[in-house]
Amino acid sequence: MKLEFKNIKKIFGQKTALNNISFTVKSGHAFGLLGRNGAGKTTTIRILMNVFKSTSGEIYVDDKPINYQTVSFGYLPEERGLYPKEKIFDQLIYFATLKGMDKKDAIKSVNYWLDFLNMTEYKDKRLDTLSKGNQQKIQLISSIAHDPDIVVFDEPFSGLDPVNAKLLENVVKEQVKQNKIVIFSSHQMNYIEEFCDDILILKNGEIMISGNIKKIKQSYQRDKLLISSKDEKQILDTFPEQAEKDNFGNIILHLKKPEDKQKTMQKLIKEYDI
């Protein structure tokens, strides 16, 4: 399957939320959608899932306008939302069948993912008796148990401890292995680099960078960092001889030595809102 966004534009009143957004993702690949809050990531996802209609542009699947009756989606929202007082197994089966899966297949799939995430012992418990991390695992299962064609993860690693983050990594790899289209929305580049072949970085509804991660990294000089931050003044003051602003409002930080890149990045992430 090939998913293609073609010149998608979305206008709310006088505000252009997305301006001519285009990208392509194929089955068996993960795609990273990056940007700070308000960049346009959520609007892009909602247009993809037919929550919003685009002002102009088109979405294609296998070179034909998308048919939402035949393409199935799995969506893990940043805001979690299952029934806290209901038994876990019952509601997972309910959601899988609600999304069109046969009950027998739903039972098999739910049991598979409960086992995959080491959650079988909790299947007959209520959701509100579980820890936050385990509740997130159940939410994850509800988004993929019905075997969707396209899986969308919206800030999936938010609030996860390292153990659960690793489990989620394994789920993502399994989805790619099963030939799904996987779309990540995140502001955490380290996770995006772990899974994604291609990325699209948004700022104020505009594409800043788009393409294959490896090729993008090769095309940029090793002695520079491109930074987008709310703390731009502090960064410019901290690195007065090394930092400058580009035409897009980003900061270009010139490294004294290329081998300092990792150390400098860690300092920036720790001390500033990057």
List where the protein language model places each region.
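Conserved catalytic Walker-motif region of ABC-type ATPase nucleotide-binding domains
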Residues: 5
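Alpha-helix N-cap/helix-start and coil->helix boundary motif
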Residues: 9, 66, 89, 189, ...
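ABC transporter nucleotide-binding domains
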Residues: 10-184, 189-203
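Non-catalytic surface loops within mature trypsin-like serine protease
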Residues: 27, 121, 229-231, 257
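ABC transporter nucleotide-binding domain
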Residues: 169-255
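Non-catalytic connector elements of ABC transporters
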Residues: 244-274
